[in-house]
Structures are given as structure tokens and as C-alpha cells.
């Protein structure tokens, strides 16, 4: 493993339709087996569905959903003596965004609608309204951190 320096972050180009870098990252996470055009079709289809169903600006709904799912705090395992403690730590903004994207996609994949675009649009609308499994996951994470607040002095 390299020890000298951190690798520089790769620049992610904004998506072609909306010109949004975060949406581009989201598409890359939706993508399976390198099929980017399929992922683009799914995400753009979901955003169109949001526009028709909710009569709201789809990019605004997307960012609202993402912000509602972003965790502010999480627990990490820390071994002290013979015991392992779940220590609450603050989440860096880039990790917070990555977790929110991951949770939104996994919650959408677990839904029962017929198409992935339909599942994704449903989950994004739910998350924008502070409902759905992705928001539940964030609340569970925060609850876990609150329950283990006594171990916060083990932070590193």
C-alpha cells in the first residue's frame, strides 16, 4: 500500500441533460456491468416520471431527496481492551453523499414496482417527503449513534 500521499480525486463530468455532477455520480452508482446508457435511461426515466407524477421540478426533488437521506453521524467499531464499542463519529460530507446515494439505490431496488425507473422515482419522491426505506435507514443510523453516545469519548 502507498504511504506517501493520498491519491487525487478523479474529476467526474456533469451529466449531459441537466449538467449536474451529483446526478452524474448517482447515474454511475445505478450503472451495472458498465452499461452507462442503460443507467442514464433509468435515471432520466425516473426524473421524467417525477415531473409528470408530482408536477415538480425533477432535479429539485432529486436534491431534496438526497439531502433528506444524508446521514450526519454514524457508528464505527472500535476495539478497546477486549471489548468492541460502537463509537459515534461525524460523517464527512463526501462520505455522507456517497452513503445517501447508495441507500437510495438499494431502497429503490428493494421496491416492488415493475421497472427500475418506476422504483427509483417512487423512492426519490418518498425520500423528498421524508418517507421511504432510505430515510428509515438514515434514522436508524442516527438512532444507533444516539444509543451509543456514552462511547463518544473513544473517538479517534
UniProtKB/Swiss-Prot annotation:
One BP annotation, GO: translation
**Alphabetical keyword list:** Ribonucleoprotein, Ribosomal protein, RNA-binding, rRNA-binding, tRNA-binding
Its assembly, as annotated, is: Part of the 30S ribosomal subunit. Contacts proteins S9 and S11.
Q: Which family does it belong to?
A: Belongs to the universal ribosomal protein uS7 family.
Q: Which HAMAP family match?
A: Ribosomal_uS7_B (MF_00480_B)
What is this protein for, i.e. what is its function? One of the primary rRNA binding proteins, it binds directly to 16S rRNA where it nucleates assembly of the head domain of the 30S subunit. Is located at the subunit interface close to the decoding center, probably blocks exit of the E-site tRNA.
Give the NCBIfam families listed for this entry: rpsG_bact (TIGR01029)
Q: What is the protein's name according to its record?
A: Small ribosomal subunit protein uS7
Give the source species.
Answer: Rhizorhabdus wittichii (strain DSM 6014 / CCUG 31198 / JCM 15750 / NBRC 105917 / EY 4224 / RW1)
Amino acid at each position: 500500500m502507498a504511504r506517501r500521499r493520498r491519491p487525487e480525486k478523479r474529476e467526474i463530468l456533469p451529466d449531459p441533460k441537466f449538467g449536474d455532477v451529483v446526478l452524474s455520480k448517482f447515474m454511475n452508482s445505478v450503472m451495472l456491468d458498465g452499461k452507462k446508457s442503460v443507467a442514464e435511461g433509468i435515471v432520466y426515466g425516473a426524473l421524467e416520471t417525477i415531473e409528470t407524477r408530482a408536477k415538480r421540478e425533477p432535479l429539485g426533488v432529486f436534491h431534496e431527496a438526497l439531502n433528506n437521506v444524508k446521514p450526519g453521524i454514524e457508528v464505527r467499531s472500535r476495539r478497546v481492551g477486549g471489548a468492541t464499542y460502537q463509537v459515534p463519529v461525524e460523517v464527512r460530507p463526501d462520505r455522507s453523499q456517497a452513503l445517501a446515494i447508495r441507500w437510495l439505490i438499494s431502497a429503490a431496488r428493494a421496491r416492488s414496482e415493475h421497472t427500475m425507473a418506476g422504483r427509483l422515482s417512487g423512492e426519490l419522491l418518498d425520500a423528498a417527503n421524508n418517507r421511504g426505506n432510505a430515510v428509515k435507514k438514515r434514522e436508524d443510523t442516527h438512532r444507533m449513534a444516539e444509543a451509543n453516545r456514552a462511547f463518544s469519548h473513544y473517538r479517534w
